[in-house]
Amino acid sequence: MNNDSLAIIKQSIKTIPDYPKPGILFRDVTSLLEDHTAYKATMDILVQHYKDHGFTKIVGTEARGFLFGAPLALELGVGFVPVRKPGKLPRETISESYELEYGHDVLELHTDAINENDKVLVVDDLLATGGTIEATVKLIRKLGGEVKHAAFVISLPDLGGAKRLEEMDLELVTLCEFEGE
């Protein structure tokens, strides 16, 4: 990975103190999206890293995972599968509940979106506690998909998500890390 590109990416991410609650330093990836150079650098790095992995599907988690997963799928020439909150997907779904850094939620995946022939990469904007991706991986594996890789733009290592996901036999790629919550 190009250190100059990684620096551009990290510098483009704004930190918002006390959002969504006091004591949290929110890492705002939307500021990266507003910066064409940073967004392109992000996508270029992900494409270069994953172009020869043989994935058949990219799964993105609601909602900011879509912003990186869908363009990556397009560039890799594979399908994109959204994982959504309850009631947002129109076909038959399976669901998985999970804990996140600010509470509890549920994710859903179409039952016909992944099968035993799929080799899947999971993409999200941020790795914090790992709960969202753990639930996403469980959904994919329930449908028979193989998932061994997850990619993130941002990681907050102090929250332990990387360790949690590595215990699920996932190989992680993170473009930049920030201290704290």
From Swiss-Prot:
Family: Belongs to the purine/pyrimidine phosphoribosyltransferase family.
Main location: cytoplasm
Entries under Pfam families matching the protein: Pribosyltran (PF00156)
Known partners and oligomeric status: Homodimer.
Keywords: Cytoplasm, Glycosyltransferase, Purine salvage, Transferase
One GO MF term: adenine phosphoribosyltransferase activity
Ranges annotated as spanning the membrane: none
Enzyme class: transferase
Function: Catalyzes a salvage reaction resulting in the formation of AMP, that is energically less costly than de novo synthesis.
Subcellular compartments: Cytoplasm
Gene3D superfamilies: 3.40.50.2020
Matching HAMAP family: Aden_phosphoribosyltr (MF_00004)
Gene Ontology annotations of biological process type: adenine salvage; AMP salvage; purine ribonucleoside salvage
Catalysed reaction, written as an equation: AMP + diphosphate = 5-phospho-alpha-D-ribose 1-diphosphate + adenine
Biochemical pathway: Purine metabolism; AMP biosynthesis via salvage pathway; AMP from adenine: step 1/1
Gene Ontology cellular-component annotations: cytoplasm
EC number from the UniProt entry: 2.4.2.7
Protein name stated in the entry: Adenine phosphoribosyltransferase
Signal peptide: none
Keyword Lipid metabolism: no
